[in-house]
A protein has these predicted regions:
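Metal-dependent catalytic neighborhoods of phosphoester/phosphodiester hydrolases
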Residues: 122-132
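Metallo-beta-lactamase
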Residues: 1-100, 108-120
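Acidic, His- and aromatic-enriched active-site or binding-groove loops in soluble protein domains
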Residues: 133-137
Length: 137
């Protein structure tokens, strides 16, 4: 996503993971396969990779900078979270790099807003440091 401004507020984002990921039947197990195929045929490559029969999934964090505050919206998957299985076990360095590329440090964040509490929206809210879970922000 290209950064944009609304008045004196800057909105940008950075990605933890982006690309073909899971088959449609895994994401929507109760859907009718024939109906799903008809809809998938209409989807652009940014949403569905037909060659691999995989939905494209993007995990990203939005950064809202106001003159007074830095706000994060959703904190992606995070690291070392128990019970998530290998499907969410991918390198998280891109998220850390994205944070740095925005010139941000964890202590620069004033507010974190999670749109909802699924694992891919609140993962970096905490980090495992020295065997203990600590708040990231």
């Amino acid at each position: 996503m290209r950064p944009f401004t609304v008045g004196d507020i800057l909105v940008s984002s950075f990605v933890e993971r982006d690309g073909p990921w899971r088959p449609p039947g895994v994401m929507f197990p109760t859907s009718d396969p024939a109906t799903a195929r008809a809809h998938l045929a209409e989807m652009p490559p940014a949403v569905y990779d037909a060659a691999q029969d995989l939905l494209v999934i993007t995990y990203q964090t939005f950064v809202v900078r106001t003159p007074k505050h830095n706000i994060l919206i959703d904190t992606c998957v995070g690291e070392h979270k128990p019970g998530r299985g290998p499907v969410l076990d991918f390198s998280k360095q891109s998220w850390l790099d994205g944070f740095a590329a925005h010139g941000l440090r964890f202590e620069d964040i004033d507010y974190v807003f999670c749109t909802h509490l699924h694992v891919d929206h609140c993962g970096w809210n905490t980090r495992l440091i020295g065997g203990k879970w600590v708040p990231t922000f």
